[in-house]
Amino acid sequence: MNIRLLHDRVIVKRKEMESKSAGGIVLTGSAAGKSTRGEVIAVGKGRVLENGNIQPLDVKIGDTIIFNDGYSVKVEKIDNQDVLIMSESDILAIVEE
């Protein structure tokens, strides 16, 4: 499926979070909770300013990000994979490794 994102929209693949219980048992999936980290897999052209110019996004494809998992983040299934669609303003940080 081809998707063309509008404005400052970003598609993110959520990274699975691995954590350990107090007893040292590794928890994965729903037992570990939802991660607020992900990888950017698609970006729009940028935010349209009042003067009509387009401000490019700070994030790019391949970036690992930390995001706000709020009401404005939409979950969609694309090519049988759950992804998140959000505005760049929902992104809190870019993780530099």
Swiss-Prot record:
Pfam families: Cpn10 (PF00166). The keyword DNA damage does not apply. One of its GO terms (cellular component) is cytoplasm. InterPro entries: Chaperonin_GroES, Chaperonin_GroES_sf, GroES-like_sf. One of its GO terms (biological process) is chaperone cofactor-dependent protein refolding. Belongs to the GroES chaperonin family. This is Co-chaperonin GroES. It comes from Buchnera aphidicola subsp. Thelaxes suberi. The gene is groES.
